[in-house]
A protein has these predicted regions:
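Alpha/beta-hydrolase superfamily serine-hydrolase fold, recognizing
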Residues: 2-22, 29-30, 36, 41, ...
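A domain-start/cap signature at the N-terminus of enzymes
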Residues: 77-92
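N-terminal targeting or regulatory segments adjacent to alpha/beta-hydrolase or S9 domains
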Residues: 1-81
Length: 315
C-alpha cells in the first residue's frame, strides 16, 4: 500500500480552520492553507503547491509551445492509492449511439451501500487529455469514502474527436448507468455527476441537453468550466497574495489566460457558437431545470472568478 505524501495533520487543520466568508460578493466555505495565520483571506501560496510551481517554472513548463503529446504524457501526473479497504475495479466497453464503444471503469467499495446513488466522474484535461492511469486511484478512494459505485468513462478526446463527441459519450454513459443502476450496485436510478475542469464542462452540457429528464440528482464540480471567454473576468486585484508569492500565484492564472484561444479551435472546431448554452453554461436559459451544484474552487485560479460571477447570476 502506497503511503500519503503529506501529513494527515494537514487535513485535520484544514477542517478545523474552515470558515464561511463573503468573497467577491459570494458566500463561500473557505479552507485556509495549513499554517496560514490570522483571519484574512488566503494570502499565501500553499507551500506544497509552490514547490511544484517552482519546479515547473525552472523547467520552462508553461512558456513552451503547446504540445499535445507532452500534455497527454506529463511525468508529474502521479497519484497514490490511499484506500485502506477493498475496492473492486472492472473494465467495461459501453456501447453509445449504436456506433461505438466507450472504455469505462467501474469501482465498487467492498461494503457499498445500495441506498447511495452511483457517482459518474468525468475527468478534466482541456477536453484533450486524461486517462485512467491518472485518475484510477482517485476513483478508488472516492468509492471507498462514499461507500458507493463510481464510474469513470474514457470519453473521446479532441482534437481527433472534436465537439460533440465527448458530450455524446457523456450522455450515453449517464443513460447507461441510470438504466443499469441495480446491476451496478445502487437502488437509485438517479446519479451524482462529478468532474474537474473540462469534465465539469461536460456535466454542464449534459445538464442543458438532458434538462427534461430527472436522472441527475446533483453535480459536484471542481474548478468548473463555465464560460468559454474568461478574459473579461481577469482582475488581479481580486486576488489577495503576499508580495513574495505573487509570481507563483500569477504563473497559474497567466498560463490559463494564454490557453483560452486553443479551446474553440481544438475542442469546438468551429462547429458551434462558443456562446451557445450547450457549451457555455454561463448563458444557460432555463434555470428551473438545473440540479443542485456544488463548486469546489482553487485559491488562485481564473476559473474561481468566473464561478463567483456565475453564482451571483444564479442567485
Amino acid at each position: 500500500m502506497e503511503q500519503r505524501q503529506y501529513s494527515e495533520e494537514l487535513i485535520t487543520e484544514l477542517q478545523k480552520n474552515a470558515r464561511v466568508e463573503v468573497i467577491n460578493g459570494v458566500e463561500e466555505l473557505v479552507k485556509p492553507v495549513p499554517g496560514q495565520k490570522g483571519e484574512t483571506r488566503l494570502d499565501i501560496v500553499d507551500p506544497h503547491v509552490k514547490t511544484i510551481i517552482q519546479k515547473k517554472m525552472s523547467e520552462g513548463i508553461g512558456s513552451k509551445p503547446f504540445s499535445l503529446n507532452f500534455d497527454r504524457n506529463r511525468p508529474e501526473n502521479i497519484t497514490y492509492d490511499l484506500t485502506t479497504s477493498e475496492v473492486s475495479e472492472e473494465e467495461q466497453l459501453v456501447e453509445v449511439d449504436h456506433d461505438h464503444y466507450v472504455d469505462t471503469f467501474v469501482f465498487k467499495a467492498e461494503h457499498a451501500n445500495k441506498a447511495n446513488p452511483i457517482l459518474v466522474y468525468f475527468h478534466g484535461g482541456a477536453f484533450m487529455t486524461g486517462k485512467i492511469e491518472e485518475f484510477g486511484k482517485q476513483m478508488k478512494y472516492i468509492a471507498e469514502q462514499a461507500q458507493a459505485t463510481v464510474i469513470f468513462p474514457q470519453y473521446r478526446l479532441a482534437p481527433e474527436n472534436p465537439y460533440p463527441a465527448a458530450i455524446n459519450d457523456a450522455m450515453g454513459i449517464i443513460k447507461w448507468a441510470s438504466e443499469n443502476h441495480e446491476l451496478l450496485g445502487s437502488n437509485s436510478e438517479k446519479l451524482v455527476l462529478a468532474g474537474d475542469s473540462a469534465g465539469s464542462g461536460l456535466i454542464n452540457s449534459c445538464i442543458v441537453l438532458m434538462k427534461d429528464t430527472s436522472i441527475i440528482a446533483r453535480a459536484v464540480e471542481l474548478y468548473p468550466a463555465i464560460d468559454n471567454d474568461m478574459k473579461p473576468y481577469y482582475d488581479w486585484s481580486k486576488f489577495d497574495v503576499c508580495p513574495e508569492d505573487e509570481q507563483y500565484a500569477k504563473n497559474r492564472v497567466c498560463r490559463m489566460l494564454n490557453s483560452i484561444d486553443n479551446f474553440e479551435k481544438n475542442y469546438l472546431h468551429y462547429k458551434i457558437d462558443p456562446r451557445d448554452e450547450v457549451v457555455d453554461f454561463f448563458n444557460v436559459r432555463d434555470w428551473s431545470k438545473i440540479p443542485p451544484i456544488t463548486f469546489i474552487l482553487n485559491q488562485y485560479d481564473l476559473i474561481t472568478l468566473v464561478a463567483e460571477e456565475f453564482i451571483k447570476k444564479a442567485l
